[in-house]
Amino acid sequence: MDYQNIFNQDFYPTPENVIADMLKMSDIQGKIILEPSAGVGNIVDYLQKAGAKEVIACEINDKFRAVLSGKCEIVGDDFLSMAKERISHIDMIVMNPPFSMAKDHILHAWEIAPDGCEIISLSVIICNNIQS
């Protein structure tokens, strides 16, 4: 797959060592986990290898959804329109959201996560003025 044009649209596959760092304080064994902006499935692959009971995903890009369809159940395309009821059975949300929409993805995850659900997100914080 040619990722060249897609990288300009906030796609960046998460390296395995970064995923390992994201999850080093969490127990994913036997958990049902949502990856809401799954891309080509790097996080999905890692979670499955590490012992998750089930991994489900959302992905808005048609080409990426085609890649993911052989890896896990795809429960939606646009995560930001995902209803709370659709994921009421999950234990965790693990994500590396698009930089340009990271805040929206994190806040939406917080709004729809079932009680007791752990949310783990990779994100970049850019400070324009540290004093403010």
Annotate each predicted stretch with a short phrase.
Residues M1-S132:
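Class I S-adenosyl-L-methionine-dependent methyltransferase catalytic core
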